[in-house]
């Protein structure tokens, strides 16, 4: 698939019959997989991304064995390249399939052990699925790395996240820990965050709680809808 090209006139160049593979839902490396992986270990993650996006077939056992044998090479890659590829992989349409594919899940967990809660996407009701589909990368990462340990702090230390995005993740994490896993909080807490940190922080916290909750909490859903359309008042100096 990666070897299909088009010129400025729209003429298609497909030297390895990638178009046919795409129709069949067949994902594989060009040539010797072991050699191709060693040329760039990031291709392990690219295989997972392409498999989740295009494959209609099961994994090739021999190929998976070669991927696993080369996993140590991932440590040679820069953190920026790893994060960039993770952003391409962590798409709402991929997450449910990823969380149900044992092989993809195992490989991702070995490469990114900080994504401890990736299984959360395996059982989404319609409301949770809608939230996930409308969420950006940073919120999706928050769902996977935040727990009652310092796991999210380590993820932020390990990868180069912008200060703005780092603040978003920390806000959810701190609120989670301060409120005992969101067991104790009320509208007053949310209002305070709205006025000090803005709408995005409130929606992040509420949507995080909705997705993490085992039961549907109508009060949370109502709050989320309220703050979605709420405008922060401008206080005169």
Language-model segments: residues:
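Glycine- and charge-enriched loop/helix tracts that form the active or gating conduit
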Residues: 1-157
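C-terminal subdomains that position terminal phosphate/3'-OH groups for nucleotidyl transfer/ligation
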Residues: 105, 111-237
């Amino acid at each position: 698939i990666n070897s299909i090209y088009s010129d400025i006139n729209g003429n298609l160049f497909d030297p390895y019959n990638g178009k046919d593979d795409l129709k069949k839902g067949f994902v594989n490396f060009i040539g010797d997989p072991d050699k191709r992986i060693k040329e760039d270990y990031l291709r392990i993650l690219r295989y997972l991304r392409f498999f989740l996006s295009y494959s209609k077939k099961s994994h090739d056992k021999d190929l998976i064995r070669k991927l696993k044998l080369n996993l140590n090479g991932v440590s040679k890659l820069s953190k920026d390249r790893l994060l960039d590829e993770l952003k391409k992989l962590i798409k709402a349409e991929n997450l449910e399939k990823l969380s149900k594919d044992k092989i993809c899940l195992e490989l991702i967990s070995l490469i990114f052990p900080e994504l401890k809660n990736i299984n959360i996407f395996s059982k989404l009701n319609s409301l949770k699925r809608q939230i996930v589909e409308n969420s950006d990368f940073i919120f999706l990462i928050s769902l996977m790395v935040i727990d009652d340990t310092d796991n999210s702090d380590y993820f932020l230390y390990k990868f180069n996240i912008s200060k703005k995005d780092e603040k978003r993740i920390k806000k959810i994490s701190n609120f989670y820990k301060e409120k005992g896993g969101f067991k104790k909080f009320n509208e007053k807490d949310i209002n305070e965050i709205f006025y000090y940190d803005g709408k995005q922080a409130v929606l992040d916290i509420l949507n995080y709680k909705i997705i993490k909750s085992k039961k549907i909490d109508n009060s949370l859903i109502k709050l989320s809808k309220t703050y979605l359309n709420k405008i922060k008042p401008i206080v005169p100096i």
